[in-house]
Amino acid sequence: MYRSFGKRLFDLLVCLPIVLAVSPVLLLAAALVKLESRGPVFFVQERLGRYGRTFLTYKFRTMTHRKREATAEILPGHSEVTRSGHWLRRFKIDEFPQLLNILNGDMSLVGPRPALPDHINEYNEDGLKRLLERPGMTGLSQVSGNIYLSWPDRWFYDAQYVKRLSLLKDATIIIKTVAVVLLGEERFLKKPHADPEQTSETEAANSGPHDHRHAA
């Protein structure tokens, strides 16, 4: 019931008040991006959605405006991240425009993070399972270490989320996300304990795609 109908209703009931509450923050962030560097306010990129359908995600631009490889790895302290971009990334404010993706049904508040289309070629069985639900602004892997996890570990968490999806699980992840934003992802690093039959597959797939926290 929750998976087929309640989750979408939950997204709308929670997302609409959030959009109204953070509107001043969105306007301030847009102004900072525009004033600090030349280029568009938003970074727009094609990502994988439910059942492998592609859609456009929106984020506040946090880097200097120039062409770069789509899979270039961008870590904290990167020289091309702007001053305002550093703070937008630190407190995840750069992700706020994805609230619009949630309202139009491309994303959910909670779910596997939307991946680049090219990454589907790297997926193991867990990676493919993450495509069974709408991608989320936050998810189980994001509150379990995120960039400090290997790709197979992230996919494992995503697959576990899809398997055990519930209202309580979504509410718990949202609450944990607040703690992660305030305290940092590294403090919440938690290595998954895979089922024995999954171990060999996970080890074989341990060289997943590069991290895609880039050009945002």
Report residues per predicted region:
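Amphipathic alpha-helical recognition patches that constitute DNA-binding helices
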Residues: 4, 52, 83, 98, ...
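Conserved catalytic core of Hanks-type protein kinase domains
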Residues: 34-35, 90, 102, 146
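Short, glycine-rich, amphipathic interfacial segments at transmembrane boundaries or analogous
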Residues: 43-80, 138-156
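A hydrophobic, helix-centered structural microdomain
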Residues: 1-65, 172-216
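A short, structured surface patch at a secondary-structure boundary
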Residues: 76-134, 174-177
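Short, hydrophobic secondary-structure boundary micro-motifs
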Residues: 29, 44, 72, 110-112, ...
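Glycine-rich flexible loop motifs, especially short His-Gly-Gly/GGXG/HXGH segments used as catalytic or interaction
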Residues: 1-15, 44-45, 140-142, 146-167, ...
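Positions in alpha-helical segments
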Residues: 15, 30, 43, 82-86, ...
